[in-house]
Swiss-Prot record:
The modification Phenylalanine amide is found at F100. This is Diptericin-D. GO terms for biological process: defense response to bacterium; innate immune response. Has activity against E.coli. Residues 1-18 form the signal peptide.
Length: 101
């Protein structure tokens, strides 16, 4: 009988402790500034395949968040087909953005 009471007391104490929320609540970290990637391709055996990859990365933002500058590099190439491989096309661009808000 003592064992039964001991088990009941343990079960009740565990049930009470399970309802308590943790006291330590950490703030959610800011998401990292990762680049946006876009890629694509397609084709067939007869005409060859095209491949393209572009990225966009914000490199600077003003303190108030209204002004920002971004960089956009890219690569594309046609592979195979009746005329063979094309030369790779490398490109890079920069852009400025203003938020009217």
């Amino acid at each position: 009988m003592k064992l039964f009471y001991l088990l009941v007391i343990c079960a009740l104490s565990l049930a009470v402790m399970a309802d308590e929320k943790p006291k330590l609540i950490l703030p959610t970290p800011a998401p990292p500034n990762l680049p946006q990637l876009v890629g694509g391709g397609g084709g067939n055996r007869k005409d060859g395949f095209g491949v393209s990859v572009d990225a966009h990365q914000k490199v600077w933002t003003s303190d108030n968040g209204r002004h920002s500058i971004g960089v956009t590099p890219g690569y594309s190439q046609h592979l195979g087909g009746p005329y063979g491989n094309s030369r790779p096309d490398y490109r890079i661009g920069a852009g400025y953005s203003y938020n009217f808000g």
